[in-house]
Amino acid sequence: MSYDVYYSTGGGSMVYGGSDVWVNNWLREVAPKLDYPSKLLIHRRRPDGKNVEFDTSIEILWQGDDPKKFNTYMNECRKLHILHGYYTPHKLITQNQDRLSSVVIHVSTDLSLKAGFQLGVPKLKHFSANPKWERQVSKMADKVIWIGLDKIPLHDEVDVIDIPNYYEFKNNLSCNESNVVGFAARCETRKAPHFLDGIDSLAFTDIKDWRWWRAHYKCMFEKTRLYQFNYKNIHRFYGRQDWGISHSCHLNEPFGYSIFQAFDYGKLPILQMDWIKDFKYPFRAFTKEQFKEQVDNISNLSVQERNDYLGDFREYLRRYDNKSEWSDKYLEIYNS
């Protein structure tokens, strides 16, 4: 029987970042409405000792469970759609480029790899990535989809379909009076975790990556309480009332689920200069020193003033609270 393959590197209850959140949204909102028989192929080993659950009825195969079947499914599919792929070349993609119908781009590696230079950080903390591959796979695919809010260099090289992610505001909490800063993100360079050094803060991230910053950038983080990231605890962390300012100062952020969560949970964020830059918002920073100044500025605000700033921006962000529109745009591509 003929079928389409949807290729990913993760998903289900195994969530490490925004791309996994995106895949789970796709499984819930798009997969049930696909017209053609389909399979989800996850190109990695299933984690040992972990039960990864999926909210979908679509057939799922992990590459590590049956490499031979995985390759057969890839090589014999009608169409291949990359939901989230690796940022370096792989022969399973290149040998099936004539089947490659679409690819979803979740981050601009071109911009992301420049973050260290832009922020003045001598050593780059980054996942394995090759910007040449991003361009190559985009040129192989019939359709290229970008999930972000702003244009990226790839827009100048290929035709790109812009389908920004969505976020549903379900909490709409008010700000509190805490001046403690919270950080809930991966520790790659463009997220600027070193901005927290010397600031009373909480960090909800990967402990191993956090130690990299202590070893390579000589951050002491003596005022930071560290909590190992586990996605099932994300809402508990944002719901805490012992922090009130969000370190959302992430450079070249494609969409920013964690930033939307900060607005949703009443954590007034400090943003980078480039995130929705057309919206007038006073609490932005580019350097570590500017970040500290903005922490001080917010600390001098009343709770009402914080709510006013947060509320105005949150209302603006509701334009991305559009789940049905988001899924319809993808279905138009996949069911065509």
Stretches found by the model and what they are:
Residues 107-145, 239:
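Membrane-proximal helix-turn-helix segments that form the acceptor-binding/catalytic region
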Residues 109-111, 149-152, 159-173, 209-210, ...:
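Short beta-strand->alpha-helix junction loop in the catalytic core
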Residues 7-17, 21-67:
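N-terminal strand-loop element at the rim of the active site
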Residues 171-191, 200-202:
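Conserved donor-binding/catalytic core segment of Leloir-type glycosyltransferases
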Residues 18-25, 186-200:
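A conserved mid-protein helix/loop that constitutes part of the nucleotide-sugar donor-binding site
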Residues 245-259, 272-281:
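Nucleotide-sugar-dependent
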